[in-house]
Amino acid sequence: MVSGFTKFKERFQGFENQYVIIGGTACDLIMENEELPFRATKDVDIVLIVESITAEFGMQFWEYVKEAGYEHLNKSTGNAQFYRFTSPKSKEYPYMIEIFSRNPDFIILEDDAVLTPLPIDDEISSLSAILLNEAYYELLKTGQMMVDGIPVLSPTCLIPFKAKAWLDLRERKLNGEQVDSKNIKKHKNDVFRLAQLITANTRQVLSLEIAEDMKKFLSEIADETVDLKSLGIRGTDKKKITEMLYQCYGLKDNT
């Protein structure tokens, strides 16, 4: 589990309908719950459900940030907002919290609050585009599950998010943008890690747009190398995993 996450969980009891954990932390919580290994991650990625958000949550979150003593408080600009808080005063708090809101005014700031501009890197830009997409945002709202009292995006819904991030970052790099290859590889590997939780009977309905993205991902991944052994995945191969993903999302008859 991410260092310091226990205190976070305790602080936000009662607000479970107002946010969902995505990204590496969601994967970590889900995999740990199934007693499977996952890569190390130090940041907590949170998406706010703007239809449910309350002023109380915003105030509680700001109090938590102050209590944790985060040294660096950053905020992006634009219609949607990214907030990043890093370097807390102790390991009782997550090293980094990244929070995304389609509503820029969810946090009630005090007069002396200082938020410095947040540089928009490839990861933030990609995630922002995905979460501002209505189809993916709807999947996020309907695809949640509870793991040890924490709302997280379920494995079958996390996989399309990871696949879309891989497609997006890969396309940007091919177009000449500066994109860290490690981030591209990370999303690809996470799809295969999460696929361990899918069985022959697992099914997930996707919107037409997301289904097309998943088909594109599975088609393009066919030419990619995936080192399953290094991911701790045994007893299967890449072809079997991709076939199971086609079946899970009902894509097989259309490929």
Describe these PLM feature segments:
Residues 1-255:
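Compositionally biased terminal segments of proteins
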